[in-house]
Amino acid sequence: MRAATALPSIPSSSSPSPMASDPTELRCSSPESSGDAGAEDPAAVDAAEESGGEGGSGHIAAGTEAAPPRPPEPEPEKVARHGVLPLLGKPYFTCIMCKSHVQPPFQVVVPRSFAPLLPSRTTPATLSWRGRSWGMRFTGGRLIQRLEAGWRGFAVDNDLRLGDGCVFELLVGGGGEQERVEFRVQVLRAEIPARIRGRAGGYTSATPIVID
């Protein structure tokens, strides 16, 4: 008699496989159930636009335009180097300050070559520099012409020192019987050391200070 052999049972194809996923897990979540943070509520967007207005931060109200950028401010006129202004194209003479200019007798002798442009008699004179004016006396004549009786005030107020240069531009004047003289003056600083300024000489251009 043949013995019966027990065969292992084969699961039926209709039975669910242990590895098979639950069909409910494969379903895509609907927008309503997922709560997607990237979607915006149209009603919320409309409310934000209405509350922004013209005063809202970063928003421009409908019907308005952004203000155009302001043009750059024009640069102020550049000051000439060392405060020296361009000449006006008028007659002028230059003078290096000697001791007689910044110490008694406090006077400026005008070069002879400039004499034809100035009155031949004593007249009032005005010097202007940096918005201020100083009155003094101009002494005219054939042999010598000079600025005095008031020049001291100009020299002291502007702290003129030995070696400084001055440019005198004739604004009002002319030969003959002119009633007054007016100069525009510019000062160029020399910065000569005090130990040199104290040496002998330097009262006129004919007697300069000698530097060893």
From Swiss-Prot:
This is B3 domain-containing protein Os04g0386900. SUPFAM superfamilies: DNA-binding pseudobarrel domain. Keywords: DNA-binding, Nucleus, Transcription, Transcription regulation. Residues 93-191 bind DNA. Residues 8-23, 36-46 have a biased composition (Low complexity). Residues 1-78 are annotated as: Disordered. InterPro entries: B3_DNA-bd (IPR003340), DNA-bd_pseudobarrel_sf (IPR015300), REM16-like (IPR044837). One of its GO terms (molecular function) is DNA binding. The keyword Glycoprotein does not apply. It is found in: Nucleus. GO terms for cellular component: nucleus. The keyword NAD does not apply.
